[in-house]
Swiss-Prot record:
Belongs to the phenylalanyl-tRNA synthetase beta subunit family. Type 2 subfamily. Its EC number is 6.1.1.20. SMART domains: B3_4 (SM00873), B5 (SM00874). GO terms for cellular component: phenylalanine-tRNA ligase complex. One of its GO terms (biological process) is phenylalanyl-tRNA aminoacylation. Its cofactor is Mg(2+). It comes from the Archaea. The lineage of its organism: Archaea, Methanobacteriati, Methanobacteriota, Methanomada group, Methanococci. One of its GO terms (molecular function) is ATP binding. This is Phenylalanine--tRNA ligase beta subunit. Tetramer of two alpha and two beta subunits. Mg(2+) binds at D329, D335, E338, E339. Its main location: cytoplasm. It catalyses: tRNA(Phe) + L-phenylalanine + ATP = L-phenylalanyl-tRNA(Phe) + AMP + diphosphate + H(+).
Amino acid sequence: MPTINVNKVDLERLSNISLSDKMIEDRFPMMGVEVEEIFEEVDKSGKKQKMVQFSINPDRPDYLSVEGLARGFRGFMGITTGIQEFEVLPSDIKVTVEENKTRPYVAFALVKNVLMDELVLESMINLQEKLHWAIGRDRKKLAIGIHDFDKVKAPFTYKEIKGDEIKFVPLGYEDEEMTPREIIEKHEKGIKYAHLIQDDRFPIIVDVNGEVLSLPPIINGTLTKVTPTSKNLLIDITGTEKEAVEETLNIIVCALAERRGTIVSVNVNGKKYPDLTLKSRIISIESINKKLGLELNPGEIIQAVKKSGMDALYEDGNLIVKIPAYRNDILHNVDLKEEIAINYGYEKFEGKLPSVATTGSKDPVEKKCNAMSDLMIGLGFYEVMNLTLSNQDTLFEKMNLKVEEKDYIEVLKPASIEHRVLRTSILPLLLETLYINKHHSLPQKIFEIGDCVIIDENDTETDTKCKNIKKIAGAITHPLTNFNEIKSSTEALLREFFEDFEFENYEHPAFIPGRCAKIIKDGKEVGFFGEIHPEVILNFELEHPIVGFEITIE
């Protein structure tokens, strides 16, 4: 989990409460924020300052700054409850967005009259970097720029340029002008994030005079560098996902508003940012009490909702809950139930022994899997573990399989193109593992036991119509491996853990015709084994013969 270091005096000032070390250690964990340590450090002036290090859950990016953390703590302690609404003043500041294929989404906002000092500047920079990781995936999904607005002049333009089209002084090079291409070749940040630039097309933000504010997602210009004397801050967020860009902007402007800043809108191609419109959800009182095992009345639940920084209205057995724009973690009603539990107080829940006595034991399937693992290791195999997420290319195309979309589950918003499908088979991932380890000596014998996910339209137990099935797969590669070797290993496994099995000839696109068999148990196919087809071997950029098997355990 990400951690943040917070100045204790600053936390007290923003929380509007005096905090003892014991109070910090007792109360913050009850609102879901772990206290790692309380320590002292020497600041730039040579004075000792008491600091607190917190661990922040990834689902609460608004807690990644002392401003957001203090806001949440004020509500939790009942100092200020309900929604803290932030006014957005209108302006005539405009941003023109030209076509940008690399990072197509952008949002801007201005926060004026921020009470800035060294402490606030450090907090702002830390929030920026933490959000780069927590939401931005190290700037791949989004990048954040914060500028001294008084150094530039509106309107602004966001566009793409070629690598040698413009020169400016980047942060860290106080007097040396560089082109974007030179930045990714010489600048520390440029080298680190050069992989995010495609086809020599560089996103850039300039003002009306052509002055460069930022070269996202790499570096800002020195011209707009924020200092402790800056008070009017222009924020830009650029990225590949519109929702993430807008939510991140909301988190930052609300944090700066805690420093007495005034939020001012910016017109981006006709749309005004930031959009701090409240979200709403409807949830029943009955479902809340059922989930929490309590009998709370509407008033008690509304009080807990208000302590979480939200508002609620009771109507016909339901609550209409209003959610602030900086809360991007409320995705489902179960999230509201968790917030109610936290702010009602976990310490108020009474522990009860179950009415039925139970004795813990190992899951029979896991027990069987552990025994299988021991046997495979005894046969000279090394165990590997791959992700359940994969992609169509690895699972199907490289295996010469033709599969329709309805036969597998695809992730709606994948983090990367390599991880966008839930695997239906383990063997392709073992071939991928062999490719990664092709520089190691032969023979190589590997296996994996793990879950695959399939679509089951006849499943009546879940809403998803999907279920996990446990499989085991193995692969061997060396110049002399053959059908008999994999048959021997497969039979050893089957004799130990399966009864009354038999083999039948099997035509599988990933295997050499005539050198593949399927495993039949109780009249059903439970697996297969054989020699991998040379075309498949080449698809995975491997060189030596490979044999493999895959068996369904459960």
